[in-house]
Amino acid sequence: MFLAIFSLIHVLTYQVKLDDYSRDWINRKQAGVTSILAGVVDLKYLTRLFPTPDRILRDSEFLREHRLSFYGSEIGQKVGQPLATFLGNGTTTNCEGYIDKISIISDGNTIGARIEGWAVDRATNEIPKMVVFANQGTVSGIGFSGRLRPDVEALYPGYLYAGWLGHATFLSGTELEAYISVGTENALCKLIDIHGD
């Protein structure tokens, strides 16, 4: 009997760890996609998509022009479009979240960044699926939710996977904004002004 209980506990513990590993694997792949969509060359995550990132970067423009692969997705087509395309249902303040880290990947007139944080949709009490980054009224990148955040879970029980990671570009000296889609109406909620030189 003891052996059966011990085995069951071991199997359940392994399954929980496997779930965390699966989510992490997916998040790393998604981060590679956000890097390409934003035009930020983040080798740390591009290598998660393909072992030789140079090939992805070389073929990326062709894929974009012909709306192939992730460029053909609804989300992929939003990058570079006016933020107003997301504002059909207005704005709200019914969200919580924080930008934990901004890593500058490329500098110059146009800055490329990897951005990490967490967000919660208080209208539906759910974790948003993605974060939208905007610069001067244009969608300049996206991020995907699902990253493990025990610190957020401690404050907001039920939100263990409220973390997100994404990429965006912005012009030097301008502000980069982060939004999530909130509620059943999908109104945009501004998380925070995250950069201004």
Regions picked out by a protein language model, each given a short descriptive name:
Residues 2-12:
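Signature aromatic-anchored transmembrane alpha helix within multi-pass, membrane-resident enzymes
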Residues 77-197:
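Basic, ligand-binding patches in group-transfer machinery
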Residues 12-114:
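Intrinsically disordered, polar/acidic, low-complexity terminal segments
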